[in-house]
Design a protein with these regions (language model features):
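N-terminal active-site segment of His-dependent metallophosphoesterases
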Residues: 1-44, 172
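Structural motif
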Residues: 13-15, 46, 87, 146, ...
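Hydrophobic residues at beta-strand termini and immediately following loops
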Residues: 14, 63, 115, 137, ...
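Cys-nucleophile CN-hydrolase/nitrilase-fold catalytic domain and related Cys-dependent amidase chemistry
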Residues: 23, 27-108, 112-114, 178-208
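A cross-domain feature marking catalytic cores of carbohydrate-active enzymes
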Residues: 49, 90, 148, 175, ...
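CN hydrolase (nitrilase-like) catalytic-core segments centered on the catalytic cysteine
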Residues: 67-87, 153-252
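Active-site catalytic loop in hydrolytic enzyme cores
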Residues: 93-175, 179-196, 248-274
Length: 274
């Protein structure tokens, strides 16, 4: 159900807490964030990367689930109750691999797009297999791509470039942004890497870009001891920052932003995507 004016997308940036390995607790938080976004009249809510088990948590090897599956069903029910689109990062199991995946669910709770992270960091490749496909999905508000976190690194822009070439006019990115416990925010402000990367993509293609990170403590895995700090980010098609989440390990928050969207033409198919 659309709530915003034509040409504008109201996005809920669901900067939720994620506790490593606690799928039931995390899914309950995600459901609540979806319902809050519905009350805030959002068209879509974006949730973090690997929100079920936490990014790089060792439980991924044993507790990842199939997509579609029970976890997408839970989130789908929340989407249908709230009447909005949901983007969520989930840990996916297939017969042969575990993937760091993102899903797009429509307001009826149906799965409409699955993306498997292509640019998985070297430190996480013993947990996740890299994805090999790039797709987009046409929705009631435009055409969506789901790059996951480092898929939007500046040296890997080919991933989101391809999504834009397929007609995407908005990139909705589940993320897990973490820092060491020693990082001094005043000496080393967080976020410039993402601001630059998102602005380049936005201005190159006329796309809006939204990245949503979780908050919380990483209690296991290769980055044990690091802090996920939110600082979620929204950039308009002109490359300007129009939304930002609070910074901090405890900074759980729903941030709403009204994003202008541009009508674009798919280079691959020659079709309007606005």
């Amino acid at each position: 159900m659309r709530h915003s004016a034509p040409g504008t997308l109201r996005v809920g940036m669901g900067q939720m807490r994620v506790d490593g390995g606690r799928a039931a607790v995390n899914l309950a938080r995600a459901q609540q964030m979806v319902l809050e976004a519905g009350k805030a009249q959002c068209d879509v809510v974006v949730l973090p990367e690997c929100l079920d088990l936490g990014w790089m948590h060792p439980s991924a090897r044993t507790d990842a689930e199939r997509i579609p599956g029970e976890r997408t069903t839970v989130l789908g029910h929340a989407a249908a109750t709230a009447g909005l689109w949901v983007v969520a990062g989930l840990t996916e199991r297939t017969d042969t691999a575990v993937y760091n995946s993102a899903v797009l669910l429509n307001p009826q709770g149906e799965l409409t797009l699955l993306h498997r992270k292509v640019n998985e960091l070297a430190v996480a490749r013993n947990v996740y297999t890299a994805g090999t496909a790039i797709e987009v999905s046409r929705t009631s508000f435009g055409t969506v791509g789901l790059p996951i976190c480092a898929d939007n690194f500046e040296d890997c822009h080919f991933i989101s470039d391809a999504m834009a070439d397929l007609g995407a006019n908005v990139l909705l990115s589940p993320c897990a942004w973490a820092v060491t416990s020693e990082q001094d925010r005043n000496q080393e402000p967080y976020g410039s890497l993402w601001e630059r990367s998102y602005a380049i993509l936005a201005k190159r293609h006329g796309v809006a870009v939204v990245g949503v990170s979780n908050v919380g403590y990483m209690d296991a895995g290769a980055w044990q001891g690091r802090l996920c700090i939110g600082a979620s980010l929204a950039v308009n098609p002109a490359g300007q920052v129009v939304g930002r989440g609070p910074y901090g390990c405890e900074a759980e928050n729903l941030i709403t932003v009204d994003l202008p969207l541009q009508t674009r033409t798919s280079r691959a198919r020659g079709a309007d995507t606005g």
